[in-house]
Amino acid sequence: MIKNITGIAMSGGVDSTATAILQKQKGPVLGFFMKLNQPDYETQRDRVSQIAQKLDIKLEIIDLTEEFQEYVLKYFSASYFKGLTPNPCIICNKEIKFGLFQQAILRQGVERIATGHYAQIHKTAAGYQLHKGVDPHKDQSYFLSRLSQEQLAHSIFPLGGMHKGAIYDLVEAHGFHDFRGTESQDVCFLEQDNVVDFLEQTAEFSASSGNIVMNDGKILGKHKGLHRYTVGQRRGLGISYPVPLYVINLDVKNNNVIVGENEQLFHKTMAISDIHWISQPEREDLLHASVHIRSTHKGAQASVILKENNRASVIFDEPQRAITPGQFATIYKDTQVLGSGVIL
């Protein structure tokens, strides 16, 4: 392994461009770009190539199309087929960006890889800790909650201690004036976030209509497939009722969308499975922590009762709205990510 060479994960966005600028100031770098299932792959590739050329960075393209299909797309479709709401970004980070992509870069003789994520890594005597980025509006630590110690050991997050405004100032100072007002987007297989169109390209979702029902079994209407709905959804139900109704559950066994009033979305308890710890908690039976039930959730204080087989029961201090099976619950101690589990 060649010392002091940093790999840069480049996507063509403002964050990866700022990362490249910062790391190049510190020493030699190599740029890397992932080919996945991007709808606009050629446009994105050309954009990355232009940025790399302007910064005088050698760029290599790593094709992970088949692997992305296997690890991310299959998980995404299978989750909806089971009536779950997946988070493909978390799986992509674990298996692709910080998994196969990172491994491919390390084989090039690179020691560490810098990405444009808004998070921080702290090295301690006990290992590597993952912390929130200092910009609360851009923090991405939730999406990194499945990373391993080894993955963190080879990662650098130069933007974790910065705010977004400073990022724009930095790239503009280096001649990039077309980023202001734009946001970096994760490399994604969904064009314009059209989940339904993507899912209905697969046979499983071709003939899956069923009933929209109340908890007591009263039928209010028909749905066009469970994959079109998620817990907490109000729009697009196509039903009439004296008060607003929301999706409160997806009954896969009977192919029903169960709806109810807003207060029925609030719960104090949930179960999580497949817990992955970045940093082991001090106790093996119980911990008090802030738990985030989705990426946009601000977090809520809870008691996490640890059980066998990487499972836990979570009891919130206050009821939480729209706890959604399939999403990840990320466990924080102050700014530190301890780990995460899948909501059952």
Curated annotation (Swiss-Prot):
<dbReference type="InterPro" id="IPR014729">
    <property type="entry name" value="Rossmann-like_a/b/a_fold"/>
</dbReference>
<feature type="site" description="Interaction with tRNA">
    <location>
        <position position="117"/>
    </location>
</feature>
<feature type="site" description="Interaction with tRNA">
    <location>
        <position position="327"/>
    </location>
</feature>
<keyword id="KW-0819">tRNA processing</keyword>
<dbReference type="InterPro" id="IPR046885">
    <property type="entry name" value="MnmA-like_C"/>
</dbReference>
<dbReference type="GO" id="GO:0005737">
    <property type="term" value="C:cytoplasm"/>
</dbReference>
<dbReference type="InterPro" id="IPR023382">
    <property type="entry name" value="MnmA-like_central_sf"/>
</dbReference>
<protein>
    <recommendedName>
        <fullName>tRNA-specific 2-thiouridylase MnmA</fullName>
        <ecNumber>2.8.1.13</ecNumber>
    </recommendedName>
</protein>
<feature type="active site" description="Nucleophile">
    <location>
        <position position="92"/>
    </location>
</feature>
<keyword id="KW-0067">ATP-binding</keyword>
<comment type="similarity">
    <text>Belongs to the MnmA/TRMU family.</text>
</comment>
<feature type="binding site">
    <location>
        <position position="116"/>
    </location>
    <ligand>
        <name>ATP</name>
    </ligand>
</feature>
<dbReference type="GO" id="GO:0103016">
    <property type="term" value="F:tRNA-uridine 2-sulfurtransferase activity"/>
</dbReference>
<keyword id="KW-0547">Nucleotide-binding</keyword>
<dbReference type="GO" id="GO:0000049">
    <property type="term" value="F:tRNA binding"/>
</dbReference>
<dbReference type="Pfam" id="PF03054">
    <property type="entry name" value="tRNA_Me_trans"/>
</dbReference>
<keyword id="KW-0808">Transferase</keyword>
<feature type="region of interest" description="Interaction with tRNA">
    <location>
        <begin position="138"/>
        <end position="140"/>
    </location>
</feature>
<dbReference type="InterPro" id="IPR046884">
    <property type="entry name" value="MnmA-like_central"/>
</dbReference>
<keyword id="KW-0820">tRNA-binding</keyword>
<dbReference type="InterPro" id="IPR004506">
    <property type="entry name" value="MnmA-like"/>
</dbReference>
<keyword id="KW-0963">Cytoplasm</keyword>
<feature type="active site" description="Cysteine persulfide intermediate">
    <location>
        <position position="188"/>
    </location>
</feature>
<keyword id="KW-1015">Disulfide bond</keyword>
<feature type="binding site">
    <location>
        <position position="34"/>
    </location>
    <ligand>
        <name>ATP</name>
    </ligand>
</feature>
<dbReference type="Pfam" id="PF20258">
    <property type="entry name" value="tRNA_Me_trans_C"/>
</dbReference>
<keyword id="KW-0694">RNA-binding</keyword>
<dbReference type="Pfam" id="PF20259">
    <property type="entry name" value="tRNA_Me_trans_M"/>
</dbReference>
<comment type="function">
    <text>Catalyzes the 2-thiolation of uridine at the wobble position (U34) of tRNA, leading to the formation of s(2)U34.</text>
</comment>
<dbReference type="GO" id="GO:0005524">
    <property type="term" value="F:ATP binding"/>
</dbReference>
<feature type="disulfide bond" description="Alternate">
    <location>
        <begin position="92"/>
        <end position="188"/>
    </location>
</feature>
<dbReference type="GO" id="GO:0002143">
    <property type="term" value="P:tRNA wobble position uridine thiolation"/>
</dbReference>
<feature type="binding site">
    <location>
        <begin position="9"/>
        <end position="16"/>
    </location>
    <ligand>
        <name>ATP</name>
    </ligand>
</feature>
